[in-house]
C-alpha cells in the first residue's frame, strides 16, 4: 500500500518537475499543542499543474537524484488571473 500525501504546488521552475509542500500536524509534548510542520517534495509532474494547485502525490520509482514522488491527481486549481484581464478591469 502506497502512502498518498496532499499538498500545494509552490514551484514550477523546471519542465516536468514541481515542488510540492505537504503540511503535517504533530503534537508538541511540552507546550501541549499541535504544531504544523512542512515538508517539501520534488515530484514528477505529468499533469502540468500550476503554482497554487492542490494535488495528491504518491511515491514512485526514483526519477532523478531528488524526485521520488509523482502527482496522481489535481484536487483544485489556483484562482489566478492573467495580467491582461487585470488591466482591462481598471
Swiss-Prot record:
Q: Name one GO molecular function term.
A: rRNA binding
User: Which Pfam families has this protein been placed in?
Assistant: Ribosomal_S17 (PF00366)
Q: Which domain of life is it from?
A: Eukaryota
What does the UniProt entry say about where the protein is found?
Mitochondrion
The record ties this protein, via InterPro entries, to: NA-bd_OB-fold (IPR012340), Ribosomal_uS17 (IPR000266)
Q: Which GO terms describe its biological process?
A: mitochondrial translation
Going by the UniProt record, its keywords in alphabetical order are: Mitochondrion, Ribonucleoprotein, Ribosomal protein, RNA-binding, rRNA-binding
Query: Chief subcellular site?
Result: mitochondrion
Q: Which GO terms describe its cellular component?
A: mitochondrial small ribosomal subunit; mitochondrion
Q: What does it do?
A: Component of the mitochondrial ribosome (mitoribosome), a dedicated translation machinery responsible for the synthesis of mitochondrial genome-encoded proteins, including at least some of the essential transmembrane subunits of the mitochondrial respiratory chain. The mitoribosomes are attached to the mitochondrial inner membrane and translation products are cotranslationally integrated into the membrane. uS17m may have a meiosis-specific role as it accumulates during the middle stage of sporulation.
Which proteins does it associate with, and in what oligomeric form? Component of the mitochondrial small ribosomal subunit (mt-SSU). Mature yeast 74S mitochondrial ribosomes consist of a small (37S) and a large (54S) subunit. The 37S small subunit contains a 15S ribosomal RNA (15S mt-rRNA) and at least 32 different proteins. The 54S large subunit contains a 21S rRNA (21S mt-rRNA) and at least 45 different proteins.
Family from the record: Belongs to the universal ribosomal protein uS17 family.
Descriptive protein name:
Small ribosomal subunit protein uS17m
Q: Which gene encodes it?
A: mrps17
Amino acid at each position: 500500500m502506497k502512502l498518498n500525501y496532499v499538498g500545494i504546488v509552490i514551484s514550477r521552475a523546471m519542465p516536468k518537475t514541481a515542488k510540492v509542500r505537504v503540511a503535517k500536524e504533530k503534537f508538541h509534548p511540552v507546550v501541549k499543542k499541535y504544531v504544523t510542520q512542512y515538508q517539501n517534495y520534488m515530484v514528477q509532474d505529468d499533469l502540468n499543474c500550476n503554482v497554487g494547485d492542490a494535488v495528491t502525490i504518491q511515491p514512485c520509482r526514483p526519477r532523478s537524484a531528488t524526485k521520488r514522488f509523482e502527482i496522481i491527481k489535481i484536487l483544485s486549481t489556483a484562482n489566478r488571473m492573467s495580467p491582461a484581464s487585470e488591466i482591462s478591469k481598471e
